Amino acid sequence: MVPQELIEKIKLISPGTELRKALDDIINANFGALIFLVDDPKKYEDIIQGGFWLDTDFSAEKLYELSKMDGAIVLSEDITKIYYANVHLVPDPTIPTGETGTRHRTAERLAKQTGKVVIAVSRRRNIISLYYKNYKYVVNQVDFLISKVTQAISTLEKYKDNFNKLLSELEVLELENRVTLADVVRTLAKGFELLRIVEEIRPYIVELGEEGRLARMQLRELTEDVDDLLVLLVMDYSSEEVDEEAAQDIMQDFVKKRDPSPISISRALGYDVQQVAQLDDVLVSARGYRLLKTVARIPLSIGYNVVRMFKTLDQISKASVEDLKKVEGIGEKRARAISESISSLKHRKTSE
């Protein structure tokens, strides 16, 4: 999974940016380049040697012309200025590097030493490599990226359909108060898998830049409510009450893990289970956070008060409008919204 801080740097060289235009022109001309992005060039006077000082406004055309010289180029971090051209960059030679070519060895060492972005363009292989801190990212061809993203979105659509199906089945079981831990874990696992795919393809979409607008729209549409639903499920089914922030942490931990086991998800929810077979034997009751927020449209801040009074969704569903009005923040309108939304959901699920 590509870290968010690296994704932010990949945006600098995405198609549609002036910097990417220059890099593509450099590759097409069969040139090489070494580009160092800095906040203040004076900080790096011991590293930047020779060359000449420009301090001129950045443009793709200027960068392309300057790349015809052998030396490196120093730009401002916001890609608005060209500070130096034709310089010799001298990072600490004792910093370990796994690269072989001189340009790429310098780039890796420089990024590790300064924590800044360094871009190397290989003349021989026509490849753009971005180095940042201890990270390296090799820029992909647009055709490859589009193919990769298209496949991933197709997979996401199937996962979202399955996730929605599991949620629908869970709703039926919730209304009948016969949910097992296995049902909850199965639904959470599918949601975690869905978000993991999103995290894996996000760098590709960022790298596509303007070419990825449609993919970004599709991704947003497919996943806009998944995070919230998973957080609410964790809040509903944790063995001990957890707030939204704690539930968010649990969700994020599992999105980062590859193929989390049903046992690990169960234990994160606070259940002491040793074998997967046990999950079918553990009956659990929803607190009602998800239904209150997504079906009855009750704000989570008020939902806390409802759950605090009634404890479970089963008890909420049995409460009268008058009972519900006793909750702080619940008036006639919200009480009826809760009561009627649960009744409507029961009727809809019964008729399906």
UniProtKB/Swiss-Prot annotation:
Primary enzyme class? transferase
| Assembly description | Homooctamer.
Q: Which Gene Ontology molecular function entries are recorded, alphabetically?
A: adenylate cyclase activity; ATP binding; catalytic activity, acting on DNA; diadenylate cyclase activity; DNA binding; hydrolase activity
Species of origin reads Thermotoga petrophila (strain ATCC BAA-488 / DSM 13995 / JCM 10881 / RKU-1)
HAMAP family annotated for this entry? DisA
Enzyme Commission (EC) number: 2.7.7.85
The domain of life is Bacteria
Belongs to which family? Belongs to the DisA family.
**Role, per record:** Participates in a DNA-damage check-point. DisA forms globular foci that rapidly scan along the chromosomes searching for lesions.
Q: Which residues bind ATP?
A: 71, 89, 102-106
- Give every DAC domain span: 3-143
> What gene does the UniProt entry assign to this protein?
disA
- Return the protein name: DNA integrity scanning protein DisA
What cofactor requirement does the entry state? Answer: Mg(2+)
Q: Which residues form a coiled coil?
A: none
UniProt keyword annotations, A-Z: ATP-binding, DNA damage, DNA repair, DNA-binding, Magnesium, Nucleotide-binding, Nucleotidyltransferase, Transferase
Record's catalysed reaction(s)? 2 ATP = 3',3'-c-di-AMP + 2 diphosphate
PANTHER family cross-referenced by the UniProt entry: DIADENYLATE CYCLASE, DNA INTEGRITY SCANNING PROTEIN DISA
**Disulfide linkage:** none
**GO annotation terms (biological process):** DNA repair
